[in-house]
């Protein structure tokens, strides 16, 4: 019990230091020569990036340094500088904007792709029947996935 008190009493006495005991203040990096700065930067890089990782990170660091700063560009200027998009983003294309069900669109597109169906003489009815089968398979698959999802999460504890 006496030891912790003595240690606590010694600490306040050693806390205030005079100007003579303080280490000399280092000069700001602005006043140092470029050679001193580069050696300090190298040592700090070595601390943060071990030599094994340095070759992997080097190309990324070089690429980031070569980029010209884009100062003073407003959002408007950035958008004007970009070329217009050739195709709309996914989900906004023609196939989503066309009216009609999947089967109707498939039947309409058949004449466009006649050359792609090599030697197949499919009538519109056959194509619609195949589309019905595909839709049925999708529905069954989705039902099974939902049932599986519910079964996994209905337990009081994870499996």
UniProtKB/Swiss-Prot annotation:
**Keyword Transcription regulation belongs to the record:** yes
Q: Name one GO cellular component term.
A: nucleoplasm
Renumbered to this chain, the Acidic residues biased-composition regions fall at: 37-54
Q: Which InterPro entries does its entry note?
A: TF_A-like/BEX (IPR021156)
Top-level lineage group = Eukaryota
Q: Where in the cell is it found?
A: Nucleus
User: What's this protein's family per the entry?
Assistant: Belongs to the TFS-II family. TFA subfamily.
Q: What does this protein do?
A: May be involved in transcriptional regulation. Modulates various viral and cellular promoters in a promoter context-dependent manner. Does not bind DNA directly.
Please identify the protein, giving its name as recorded. Transcription elongation factor A protein-like 1
